[in-house]
Amino acid sequence: RGLGDVYKRQEYYEMGQDKVVALLKQEVENAIAHVETLMRSKFGDIDNPLLVSVRSGARASMPGMMDTILNLGLNDEVVEGLIRKTGNARFAWDSYRRFVQMYGDVVLGMKPVNKEDVDPFEAIIEDVKHAKGVKLDNELEVEDLKELVKRFKAAVKEQTGKDFPTCAYEQLWGAICAVFNSWMNERAILYRKMEGIPDEWGTAVSVQAMVFGNMGDTSATGVCFSRDAATGEDLFNGEYLINAQGEDVVAGIRTPQQITIIGSKRWAELAGVSEEERAAKYPSMEEAMPEIYKELDALQTKLENHYRDMQDMEFTVQEGKLWFLQTRNGKRTGAAMVKIATDLLHQGMID
């Protein structure tokens, strides 16, 4: 539910944005209208807003190489509508500040090229956290998040010479073209050379209705694997974060928690964390969200049985409801490849 299957042809990355819009305008608008009907909300509406994510869908899996934008469709008026719709001001402003930062990085080209360069958005976040006397992003309050949005937009104006776009469709077209263009970013080109993936294959762009892992303590986001990618062991595993969005899991801002009790206890032992501290501060999803865990475990089994291979999956929990974002055949070590293939053969899943 809520998926927009929209954009097909990679040669668009060679065109200017105006040509891409002209070619795809009707297709995109029809697909957005379909998603609006499914989600019973409206893109760009200030009373019942639909927010979307824009992500790549390359023919061959390229984990972490392509760009993604979340929470697209927000502006100063829509954020107030989101607050009225959800009754959750912190969530709405948190989503807004994340969107401005991602859009600035991916679409407006503000992400530093070199690690030594100052990231304007991260510098602002650290400044606000320091002034507030907190260490973690999720300790910031509504007024702090409003301040981040204000200062982020000022940074956009200063660096690009233009105001941050407020029109939902202007935001969407910028994101679509940026994701097409990310096929030719330096890390994606290098990855394709290493993996033997032809440049001509290109990528699709997928637009999905947003679900939110940052709506409070009954929401979460995570990644999981149907088998151990390092050893090939037939062991469901993964990581999740409560009250977070997908980028947080890999960004290292907070310590992710393990999906399973077994994985959580293994992690605690390696990290030198006592069982008492683990259970109190870093419980597994199996312990903290047992019903969601059961559903997740059942679905990962179903997906592996369907694709007949180890799966690498992304999911979000929004206020106690599980949503799957994507699945793909997982990358694995050479040793794991042999172990998984042997086990799948013995389990009758492959010939």
Question: Locations of the language-model features?
Answer:
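Nucleotide/phosphate-binding sheet-loop regions of phosphoryl- and nucleotidyl-transfer enzymes
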Residues: 1, 5-351
